[in-house]
Amino acid sequence: MSSFIDSIKSTSLSRALTIALGSNNFKSASTINDCKMGLYSSRLLAIPDNFSLVSSNIPSSDCSRAERTFNLILFAIVDLVICCESMAFFNLLLKLPSMLLVSFLTMLVFSISYSWSAFNWISFAFSSASFLMKACILFNSSFTWFGVKAVIAEDMLYRMVRGLFCASFVKQLQTTFLATAIVLC
């Protein structure tokens, strides 16, 4: 029977066995370490010399629970970020016609009629500045909307590969998008 265990240790199955060592809070990242064969030796001794039964006798929850939890958290965060981004961007697009119309009408009304020639240039300058500021905000927000998506995807991929996805990054994302939403609205 020991030769059976030795043969399993040398196969790819033994290298694939992992155990998740996580914490109850999300402040520290979960780590995935290789399983010790001693943890499963009592289960392996009861198995006949049939290699296909080895993986079915080892509980799958030990090896994949951390990965499933990580994926659920990751997808929930990505969904939340995309939803907040989309809502802020589309709210701005819905307000765009009214912003442009009000700016144009203000510029037209206060610079041409109901004013003197000296006041004409002052009101025209203020209206033009307001119009340019709103156009600049729209341009920057649309650029940020597409640019931030790429940066977030790249950063999440990097952290996912390195296994460093943790609550501080989530808090940073929430703070960033709250600030963006406040500025846009």
UniProtKB/Swiss-Prot annotation:
GO CC terms in record: membrane
Extracellular compartment segments: 91, 140-185
Keyword field contains Nucleus: no
Keyword tags: Membrane, Transmembrane, Transmembrane helix
Cytoplasmic topological domain: 1-69, 113-118
Subcellular location: Membrane
Parts of the chain that traverse the membrane: 70-90, 92-112, 119-139
Coiled coil: none
Mode of membrane association: Multi-pass membrane protein
Disulfide partners: none
Miscellaneous notes: Almost completely overlaps VMA4.
Protein's recorded name: Putative uncharacterized membrane protein YOR331C
Phylogenetic classification of the source organism: Eukaryota, Fungi, Dikarya, Ascomycota, Saccharomycotina
